[in-house]
UniProtKB/Swiss-Prot annotation:
Family: Belongs to the class-II aminoacyl-tRNA synthetase family.
Keyword Cytoplasm in annotation: yes
Subunit structure, as described in the record: Homodimer.
Enzyme nomenclature, EC number: 6.1.1.22
Name of the protein described by the UniProt record: Asparagine--tRNA ligase
NCBIfam families membership: asnS, PRK03932.1
Cell compartments where the protein resides: Cytoplasm
Protein source organism: Clostridium botulinum (strain Alaska E43 / Type E3)
Amino acid sequence: MKNTVLIKKIYRETDQFLSKEVMISGWIRTLRASNAFGFIEINDGSFFKNIQVVFDDKLGNFKEISKLPISSSISVVGTLVATPDAKQPFEIQAKEIVIEGMSNSDYPLQKKRHTFEYLRSIAHLRPRSNAFSATFRVRSVAAFAIHKFFQEQGFVYTHTPIITGSDCEGAGEMFRVTTLDPKAPELTKEGNIDYTKDFFGKETNLTVSGQLNAECFALAFRNIYTFGPTFRAENSNTTRHAAEFWMIEPEIAFADLQDDMELAEAMLKYVIKYVMDECPEELQFFNSFVDKGLLERLNHVVSSDFAKVTYTEAVEILEKCDKEFDYDVSWGIDLQTEHERYLTEEHFKKPLFVTDYPKEIKAFYMRMNEDNKTVAATDLLVPGIGEIIGGSQREERLDVLEARMAELGLKKEDYWWYLELRKYGETKHAGFGLGFERLIMYITGMTNIRDVIPFPRTPGTSEF
């Protein structure tokens, strides 16, 4: 059947199709039939909403159609008719229905509410449910919006390597990449694994960040961004952590921390506004069934200025508040999610930049402040999530950077190329990392990172 019309186009350009014959193809979401007529709700994947098809016993295959299981695929030819007195604005009165593919009667997604936990166990089918159809469409639109924002600003999209020989975060929580025989690896004289015999001739891992490579390109193209998968071997079984996730990492030359925060705020507002404009039906669904205050919160974010406070000031606020925390607050601690959410949800009641963190809890590449105790770093905290963006001005002074690496026991020879950037026309520069899944959680109101990534990879889970 040619000249099929997408359901999205029928909804967006209804007047063009009313009282005319249309062809659609899709999957049956619901079907109910009597002896003389029946109703099918069909979804073709192009739009969040279904379209109703009415069919009667004038069809030659009426009985066969009446007994079709949920999720069977069909093609329909019929007339689009307005239904002003019904729940749906229009319906298709079928003249012909062709069965494209039968579904088994044991199809797991019957017409009832399923828990997110259950849907995770059938990740190959959950995109067909309302919640995940909405989630992954928002994910797609948000990804496009990110590229659109940076391209409109003249940024160069840069592909950084997935396999790396350096640890950007210095945390050591990395997935090793090796072709050595795990049963009998070659050893050095000291009894350690001899990685010179490995595929790359050295110890290599999956990347935790593309930032170090991105800095190389920022110092050539001025403004660049990366957008790709990253990997952390953290054994954190929480709703906010995954072993594989996507990161957006811009780097900007001739820029300081203030420039970095302004870019982060502009980008976040742009992406949220773009999704609100392009996915109104999906966001209305989330607002009704997932997070009752979602639309109000998103509108507030887009229309208000973000707050800013230093780490020291944030600690003072937390110490003086009446709220009991599970983790004690004192200067020098890494703020926990409960602290971040109190600041952004209860105290400031808006997104919040926290700046100038103690150097001990931040990465080696962050620029040392004049007090020699804090670094020019920032975390953007948002209501409902906590930290969503981490950024900093990078340390451009070679002697300071080398001293910091020595403090942390990092070998200069592992980062020789990164250090060499400081020798050839170095300038102040800054950047940040945005966890894409946390952004999707924020935009949709979904509370578990496993539910905003198609096939989540978490400790003990690599199914599908």
